[in-house]
């Protein structure tokens, strides 16, 4: 186990002290008694070989881990262990489904279900049936060994607000839906990052047969629409991965786990529109971080081979 001590400093000032494993970040504490957390791997991922890991989400003690194409693996989390339940294809499985972000809604499809509906971000450069950057709404079975596509959500942009891909995340506490993405792409020097906000759509549970209902969102439905750089010009463009909203904070793991693009956890204050924290994860984790989720009061982060637990103290 590696213990990391965190102290508040100026915005975006992250300094590593290798001898003591200290990292510095700005802003108020993340609802923690001390600016301190421990980081430890709680288990190796056991999904489908040769597929990159993408989205991850948790509900109670259960973890849903996604891979390219829409392969899913479920686990039971035991605090320091992860026990595999099953691996299966999502109902939205396909070569144009990156499954980049997994985010549970606050709505259950049926009282029998153990998990609410799962929102899966397509986040692919190409469209599926004329639809791009859609949200696939999945109903995980009670035994957590299969899933069914029950709806799609599409944002129909009129003014080309986003560039290559768009990621979606649910604010379950306040019932909002956020979209985050590049205006161009990460490799372009003129790229910016846009955040949009909608009321969380309600999914119809009456649809039957093979007709998958499609919910269309338009710019008329926007509650918020702004560029991160308008409020934080120093926001650094790096490869962005998963998203999580908790207590009004948007958690964004970015980077590739390399020296040129170190793994970092950005924490964006949604109400104040400010970068509250930027935490260097490069020595407490290894490789690319793909998504994060709150699980039983702890922050879990998925990499390309393991699940890490960050316990704030």
Model-derived segments and spans:
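Beta-strand-rich domains and repeat architectures in extracellular enzymes and scaffolds
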Residues: 40-70
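Sec-dependent N-terminal signal peptides
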Residues: 4-13
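Structural signature of eukaryotic scaffold interfaces centered on beta-propeller domains
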Residues: 49-59, 96-116, 160-175, 236-246, ...
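Structural motif
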Residues: 70-76, 115, 126-140, 185-200, ...
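Loop/turn-rich, solvent-exposed surfaces of beta-rich toroidal or solenoidal domains
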Residues: 221-270
